[in-house]
Amino acid sequence: MELPIEEIKVRKVLDSRGNFTVEADVTVPNGFGRTSAPAGASTGETEVIAFSKSGIDASIQFFESKVKRSLIGFNALDQSGFDKLLTDIDGSGNFSNLGGNLATALSMSVAKAAAQSLGIPLYRYVGGIRSTIPRPMGNVIGGGKHARNGTSIQEFLVSAQGSTFLESAYINVLVHRRIGDMLSDKFKDISIGVGDERTWSVNLSDEEAFEILNEAVKEISSEKKVKIYTGVDFAADSLYENGKYVYKHTTKSRDEQIDYAISISKDFGVYYIEDPMYDTDFDGFAEITARIGDRSLIVGDDLYTTNPDRIRKGVEKKSTNAVLIKVNQIGTLSAAREAVAVATFAGMKNIVSHRSGETTDDFLAHLSVAFGSTFVKTGVIGGERVAKLNEIARIEECLTS
């Protein structure tokens, strides 16, 4: 069956931080797809390049002059072929000409257009009969590169295990609110800020943040009679300087960082631990996983950057038991799907994730279902975050009706 691409348009739009990003429209017979690409603040060294080194306008110009003509008429049902064509025309190996964000927008828009033409939802088109609804994982206290004057650890996370996805998402909101009240009581004369992902941001030590997080979780869990997991994203690359991990009030050696990551599981009951080590330290990750992987998820984000080859290396070294998936880290839906397949075959869980600079696009909601994700990491509040949460709630309704 052929489904020729009839038209493609790309444009600049704004993301949730007010920065320019790209949006792509793809038209096929009886189908249309539109995708706006997100952007990260904390990015891995091995991610594809978001835009041409000359900027977003240069990426768009490269598309118009070098790419568009080759895509018109291409069979939209051949997703892997389309994505390979994007990669080949770019020719750089890391999308430094077209830009990984524009590649992501194009790749996802083709999938959306094909799904609409076939009359099926995107999650079904990408994932087939798979119909696992993930649990929402949302950040409630922020620091690192996502918030000024916040904690050294970039994200403190919660995931409620309610009877439905929407109930779970709402309980995460209640934890967020309770933490806001607690911080207002603790810092009566200081204005409490919010970070890029609508987390609370204030000059706290990491230990104080753990205490407040656990107190809020305990209270809401008791009130709602629901289990609530806690988690962190160390974003250790942003802490790493000259072989050390530099926090606000202390500096840790590699061995001390490993011990610290292990201790938060034991001392604070943290279940989800993302990027506890620098992104080349596969062995450091492996030591943490070997010691606490039976009771905690050790998640690779910057370690893997959704790159199938890096995930294969992690599998070989037993570095983690879970992987974060972000399409615009690797540039195409096909490559992200391969990353999930490699991880799943090795028995690793996957978590589909947003970026700090988001849009109201909801494609990651569909991917989290299509990929059978254990969690979907997409914040707690804010229109660009809630757009994904509400879409998963709608998908759950369709699957259970």
UniProtKB/Swiss-Prot annotation:
Q: Which InterPro entries match?
A: Enolase, Enolase-like_C_sf, Enolase-like_N, Enolase_C, Enolase_CS, Enolase_N
CC cofactor note: Binds a second Mg(2+) ion via substrate during catalysis.
Which coenzymes or cofactors are required? Mg(2+)
- Its Enzyme Commission number(s) read 4.2.1.11
Catalytic residue list: 197 (proton donor), 326 (proton acceptor)
Which reactions does this protein catalyse?
(2R)-2-phosphoglycerate = phosphoenolpyruvate + H2O
Keyword annotations: Cytoplasm, Glycolysis, Lyase, Magnesium, Metal-binding, Secreted
* Positions annotated to bind Mg(2+): 233, 274, 301
Any idea which GO molecular function terms this record carries? magnesium ion binding; phosphopyruvate hydratase activity
Query: Which positions does UniProt annotate for (2R)-2-phosphoglycerate binding?
Result: 154, 326, 355-356, 377
Top enzyme class: lyase
Biological process terms from the Gene Ontology for this record are: glycolytic process
What pathway or pathways are given for this protein in its record? Carbohydrate degradation; glycolysis; pyruvate from D-glyceraldehyde 3-phosphate: step 4/5
- List the GO cellular component terms: cell surface; extracellular region; phosphopyruvate hydratase complex
Name the family: Belongs to the enolase family.
Q: What is this protein's function?
A: Catalyzes the reversible conversion of 2-phosphoglycerate (2-PG) into phosphoenolpyruvate (PEP). It is essential for the degradation of carbohydrates via glycolysis.
The protein's name in its UniProt record:
Enolase
| Organism this protein belongs to | Thermoplasma acidophilum (strain ATCC 25905 / DSM 1728 / JCM 9062 / NBRC 15155 / AMRC-C165)
Name the gene behind this protein: eno
